[in-house]
Amino acid sequence: MAFNFNWSPLIADTSRARDMLTTALNKSPKPPIIVDDIIVTELNLGTTPPELEILEIGDLAEDRFRGIFKMSYAGDAFLTLKTKVQANPLKTYLSNKPDFASPQPLAAAAGLTIPLQITLSNIRLSGFVILVFSKQKGLTLVFRNDPLESLKVSSTFDSIPFVRDYLQKEIEGQLRVLFMEDLPAIIHRLSLRMLSPEYQEIETEERLEGANDTTAAIDPLASPPEDAVDAFGNPLDEAQISAMSLDSGEIHASFSQKNILRLAALSESQRTLSLFTPGIREAVFRAWAGHPDRAESGAATPALTQGSLSRIQSTFGSLKSGASSVASGSTGNETLSSRPTLASSYSTSAGISLGSGRSRAGGMRKRKKRVVDLRRKDGADSGVSTEANTPLPSTQVSDTSSVIPEEREAEEELATPPTSPPQPGRRFESRRGSLDVGTPKRIPEEPPTFGPLLAPAPLIPNASKAAKSKRTVSPPAHLEDPFVSHTSSRRPPISRNKLRQAQQSTSPLLRSLSFDKVSSLSALCSPPRISSPPNADLMSSSGGILEQAWMQKMAQEIARKVQEEKDKSSGQRRPSHSRTKTAPTGGFWQGEDEVEAPPAYVA
């Protein structure tokens, strides 16, 4: 079924259609760039009518019709609009960018309004239309989908690319709303005007009422203010106010000067970083002195005062200083004096909150004292430091000795640390130094209390170890202590703690001695009745648990034999005592040359 459109009468009268389009375009919310009404200045439907394809006929009669059509239009119709826009290219560009990628600056303090003319042409439409016609109710046309395919937008800003693209996108969006919502209402009113005489009469009456409306706009500055003042701030009476001319500028200058100054300050604050800037959305103020931030406001959330900020800085500074001191193994005084932390420098330079500085320093001193006390107590009670075996050139130094070196000798004289059975992988600390079980250890650098035994420089490493073993294995009655008087002839018997200490000191040092050195050392301290295992050469060459057990057994046998000799007769003890005392005077190495050959060993 074909339709013949009589297109010429529709082209002839388009004034009413222009008015309806203007009303429809201004009804919907406009973008912020458009600052004036949109006026349709020209509407030309062109010479090519649209094409309709019948899909369904629902109702067909003489006075009514209902059907579904497929419409397509590719004619030469065009539409010209005029409006005013705010010409701020940077603001227009930023409105197209995402918020997270734009700093939102302003290009100008005030907007610049420029007239804009837009022409819409090359309109392409395609969609499904529901058409209902009735002589009493007029023509109703509804689009089931968005019919706008494309159009061309020509404007005054075609030379600016991003403004042209922005206008193209915005106008396409407005036209899609126009076709879906406003165009059916416009067509329906036009059909009623042409078909229904009653609607024509109602419309004529509305036009007459609009023309007779002579309501003038009210000027807020036309009436005199209540607290009128002159240019110098003096109040005016009613007679002076009535004498003024309403058209002159005197009536406008009679407003309160206080309010005018406040309005001027408010206007100027929008262009500066003044503290009087009111609350603006998406704005960050450099200073804020609002009511909730004051101390006397009683707000639920406590404000960050200067003292609280300094306490926060002190907390972070103390944590940093504590971590650095633990990592370096230095004392608390060295950390505070040599490397001041962030909190101490901040408090010293700015002079903020002395109370917070004292609490910070007290906390740091308490932390340092606790670390030192733990290490001192650990070394004095157990004498065991659980760490891995270190090689011979060890560089680790005890923290206790570095903190309090002057109190080391006093603690040696007073405290006797208990010992435990030697275990592989353990490190033992005694009064004379520290040693690692299972690995050779160097002689401690600090001088012992009875130092004349090692006064001459040793020539052979084994000789120094023999001197060390001789000093530790011999009973306490034969030792010389420079701090003890020599008037006493009798000595107390050897204690169990000293015996175990001698065993620990003897075991790693005798391991590197040859068998003849061990035999000569045994001949100095005991009669030739000491029993030794027949395979001593094999055991001396091989290390491990068997060698340590044999060394302990030999030391116990030596101590037992010495105790028996002491109990037998005092006459045999005095020559041995004088023999031992001649060693420091004549030198240890001279006495070693007089050592006889080792006696025979009995199994």
Swiss-Prot record:
GO molecular function, one term: lipid binding
Protein family: Belongs to the MDM34 family.
GO terms, biological process: mitochondrial genome maintenance; mitochondrion-endoplasmic reticulum membrane tethering; phospholipid transport
Transport found in the keyword field: yes
Residue spans of biased composition, Basic and acidic residues class: 371-380, 558-570
Function noted in UniProt: Component of the ERMES/MDM complex, which serves as a molecular tether to connect the endoplasmic reticulum (ER) and mitochondria. Components of this complex are involved in the control of mitochondrial shape and protein biogenesis, and function in nonvesicular lipid trafficking between the ER and mitochondria. Mdm34 is required for the interaction of the ER-resident membrane protein mmm1 and the outer mitochondrial membrane-resident beta-barrel protein mdm10.
Alphabetic keyword roster: Lipid transport, Lipid-binding, Membrane, Mitochondrion, Mitochondrion outer membrane, Transmembrane, Transmembrane beta strand, Transport
Domain notes: Lacks alpha-helical transmembrane segments, suggesting that it resides in the membrane via beta-sheet conformations similar to those predicted for other outer membrane proteins and porin.
Topology in the lipid bilayer: Multi-pass membrane protein
Polar residues bias: start-end ranges: 333-351, 383-403, 500-509
Entry coiled-coil feature ranges: none
CDD domains the UniProt entry points to: SMP_Mdm34
Protein name: Mitochondrial distribution and morphology protein 34
InterPro entries per record: Mdm34, SMP_LBD
GO cellular component labels: ERMES complex
